[in-house]
Amino acid sequence: MKHVVIGTAGHVDHGKTALVRALTGVDTDRLAEEKRRGLTIELGFARLDFPDGSCAGVVDVPGHEKFIKTMLAGAGGIDLAMLVVAADEGFMPQTVEHLNILSLLGVRRGVVVLTKCDLADADWLAIARADLAARVKGTFLENAPVVETSAATGQGIEDLRETLHALVRQTREKSARVPFRLPIDRVFSVDGFGTVVTGTLIEGAMHVGGEAELLPSGTRSRVRNLQVHGENTAIAVAGQRVAVNLAGIKKTDVIRGDTLAEPDSVRVSRLLDVRLSCLRDSERTVENGSRVHFCHGTAARLAKVVLLDRDALAPGESAYAQLRFTEDVAAKCGDRFVIRFYSPLETIGGGIILDDAPARHKRNDAAVLSALAVQENGSGAERVLQALTALDTALPSAAQLAARLGMEETRLAPELDALLARGEAAAPLPGRFIASAVLDALWARCEALLTDYHAKNPLHAGIRAAELRQRLFRAVEPERADALLALFVHEGKLRFAAERYALADFTVRYTRRQTALRTELLALYRAADLRPERTDRVLACFDAKDRAETERVLESLLTGGELIALAPRLCLHREVYVCACALVRAYFADHETLTLAAFRDLLGTSRDSALLVLECLDRNDRTRREGDLRRPGRRLYE
């Protein structure tokens, strides 16, 4: 079933609440003060049922200028607008402001409702119709149906219901296959149940028992119960008005303007890159550095406007800007927003979010402006490639990319496939992606680093893997760093052996004297067999004048894996170590576990020597220790 939210808009006392009551039978004025004053102060909600069994949620917003902030909180999630204009008064200031807000928020469909038609004669109605047509010309309601009604007499109510039903059928259904997001417009407590939040589910689907994250705080909770239009449900989907009972959350932990979202699906930031537009009929110019009220979803925050390519934004103009906040904001690329002047409060413009967690930009930076142009107007592939490039070596998943771009994964998948096919992106790990340009830059740094290392350490077979990861990557998990380096190994650019990396064309070049020392050292360790020799004793066998040179060659043999370090200054010939591994493999063919005593007997050596070798096997994951026993390690059969 399709789920759509209809929102009222219009000047105070033009009959929005009475119209909703006539349509739905629900009085959305629930506060005593609203009853006493005869005007809507808070958001009201009702369910509108249609003959075919479908239904829509109706959000009734206040029309008084003092409550525009509340109106904005309700307007953020609507699909269809119901612009209400009283026939006896016509367009008024808040009618204009509400229409501007709907346009800025990206609402593209709706109906114009002329109310209180019983209070206007035929001549006045004709004037009202003409004025209405002129006022909506050039807006999204220019060709919208106009329905004349009277809540008092019932005139036009059925026509309006049929018109709304037709619009609902034509409205595109929102996807439930994306992470859910619910801007919170109301918070209260229910005895015996705890904290309940309400809002319009603008994306995805929520499930009872599912995990949810409160933003911008990042507090995690569990969905204890869900209600849609007062009825319990196991699942709620985008386009529905939802009440969510949250487990372990206090009422004081949540405020209107917070967002409830699928964990890790929405980023928080104090910077937003945007396309900012100033209303044509605004009397204000937005200066660089202006302080404004930023209205997004159900939230309102103070922001500083940094215009990126000019000093001022005049009425009717549009430009790229960065909004800077003093508190965290939870938003996504593609979201719409409204800005209101700081003092006096009036709507002056709005726009669309292009980057929801950017870096702090300098003004008049051509590269920044070019990147924003791609984000706004580029093809799907261009936007994906730009996002991958910006994410550097983070290796995002498709879901993370989709969330960053405000794009559904089903739309993202073919764009990613095309980039992979053209060689503009790569997948170092299954389901993890990187831009090829980032890989090229990474290789340039890696090559320069290793070239320098080889020059300074000509007798070392390579740099330790851990050291290379530390020097080459920042805040990248070892598994992902190794996957990127493995790409270079696969491409024949790097060589990896004995936990060390080297340039593929690098070889250790010994002098004649060093070659002789190497031969002698290897012969000594080979003769020692399973009796690990201390390096100081080995070095004592050589002429004192060759001591420094011998130490360098010894270090080279260790880095090259020709000698295996069992402990500080205790080494074993690699052939002996390989032989020990083979004996262990053969032993495990007939036994489940290995003891130190059995290993000693297997090698035919002393207990101390056997223990040193066995601990080395543990470190290299050839064996796995469980108390006093050993079992086959992950790398035993490599």
Please identify what each model-predicted range represents:
Residues 13, 19, 38, 60, ...:
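Residue-level signature of catalytic and energy-coupling elements of molecular machines
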Residues 11, 187, 204, 226, ...:
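Residue-level recognition of beta-strand microenvironments
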Residues 55, 61-66, 76-127:
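Conserved Switch II/interswitch segment of TRAFAC-class P-loop GTPases
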Residues 1-61, 65:
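Conserved G1/Walker A P-loop phosphate-binding module
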Residues 64-65, 88-92, 107, 116-121, ...:
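Conserved nucleotide-binding/hydrolysis micro-motifs of P-loop NTPases
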